[in-house]
């Protein structure tokens, strides 16, 4: 399912994407008989390397025909570029970081990709593993059906209502008219709640402003919520998006000349959402804030006729979140894998095998 061509061009443009203020990248194509048969990016994110104190080199945007020689040539080209820059491994796919689309889909190919989510041919796994790429980390996406509402909502409501009065928590929608400030508040929670996560890198102020501009056309206030105390202290946030891929599937990647008409008609019939993030600041964890945010998502889905919710990716090592998804009657429906190939003798594998949820 093609993404919007205009959005992909902006994302890859070194002059327009603020990611390149702290990173560099090179793009490679594989050709056979004058025809392109594959592509890959190689990139170095200095902000990631500084924050995580590592020397990771990254690859992304991997697409390839079912041809091991083409896949090998692409990975070797990316690896050579990274070795020249002193990286100790090639790790990915990340398009460009864990703040963007990441991982190779290895389970769940029968499901349509949701907004801001990659989809890959099943044979890509054998292409990468055939070139000596090993698992670094798995990411899970969970499915929760609205029809389970009557079974789960009483549990959430009990937790939320019992604890909210004690801590003076109130919920309000993110304000689209003040989106830049709302995105900064969102990232305040994000940076605190996710900072210890594997592969995490904080966004710069310029990246936050860029994100606000990208979100504004697609943000739906019904699915974006801020939790704060009565004195305005930020406690938590949740951000979900209607699955606009149900719209984009009919546009073949282009809004012009007439795709926007189809978009307007189709968006009213969107039946799924993707939870991009739901997080609580450390001092408000275990206070019912998360339960209140979960309840808000369920209530919004019920009002809008949303039948299916899919989470953003959750690290296989995040046991508390994976257990929470099970408690909400969720089931893991997609698995993404981040691979690595070590390049330096002193490089330590990032792989941690937990067995998954």
Explain the meaning of each model-derived region.
Residues 1-33, 40-51, 173-280:
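A conserved beta-strand-loop-helix scaffold within acyl/acetyltransferase catalytic domains
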Residues 50-132, 251-328:
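Acyl-donor binding region in acyl/amide transferases
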Residues 142-159, 337-357:
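C-terminal "cap" of GNAT-fold acetyltransferases
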Residues 44-47, 249-250, 264, 269, ...:
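Alpha-helical subdomain
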Residues 46-49, 98-100, 149, 209-210, ...:
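Flexible loop/turn segments at secondary-structure boundaries
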């Amino acid at each position: 399912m093609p993404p919007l061509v205009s959005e992909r061009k902006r994302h890859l443009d070194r002059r327009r994407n603020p990611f390149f203020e702290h990173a560099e990248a090179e793009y490679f194509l594989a050709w056979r008989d004058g025809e392109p048969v594959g592509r890959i990016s190689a990139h170095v994110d200095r902000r990631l390397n500084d924050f995580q104190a590592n020397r990771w080199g990254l690859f992304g945007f991997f697409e390839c025909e079912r041809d091991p020689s083409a896949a090998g040539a692409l990975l070797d080209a990316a690896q050579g570029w990274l070795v020249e820059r002193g990286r100790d491994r090639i790790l990915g796919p990340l398009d460009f970081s864990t703040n963007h689309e990441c991982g190779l889909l290895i389970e769940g190919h029968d499901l349509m990709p949701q907004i801001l989510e990659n989809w890959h041919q099943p044979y890509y796994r054998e292409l990468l593993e055939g070139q000596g790429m090993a698992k670094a980390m798995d990411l899970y996406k969970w499915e929760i059906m609205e029809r389970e509402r009557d079974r789960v909502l009483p549990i959430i409501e009990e937790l939320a209502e019992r604890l909210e009065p004690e801590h003076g928590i109130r919920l309000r929608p993110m304000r689209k008219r003040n989106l830049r400030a709302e995105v900064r508040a969102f990232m305040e929670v994000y940076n605190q709640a996710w900072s210890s996560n594997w592969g995490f890198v904080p966004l710069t102020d310029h990246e936050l402003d860029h994100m606000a501009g990208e979100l504004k056309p697609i943000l739906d206030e019904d699915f974006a919520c801020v939790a704060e105390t009565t004195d305005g202290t930020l406690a938590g946030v949740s951000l979900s998006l209607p699955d606009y891929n149900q719209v984009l599937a009919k546009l073949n990647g282009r809004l012009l000349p007439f795709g926007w008409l189809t978009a307007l008609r189709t968006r009213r019939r969107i039946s799924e959402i993707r939870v991009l993030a739901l997080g609580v600041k450390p001092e408000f964890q275990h206070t019912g804030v998360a339960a209140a945010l979960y309840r808000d998502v369920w209530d919004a889905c019920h009002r809008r006729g949303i039948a299916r919710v899919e989470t953003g990716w959750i690290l296989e090592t995040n046991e508390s979140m994976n257990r929470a998804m099970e408690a909400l009657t969720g089931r893991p429906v997609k698995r993404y894998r981040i691979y690595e190939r070590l390049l330096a003798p002193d490089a330590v594998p990032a792989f941690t095998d937990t067995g998954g949820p």
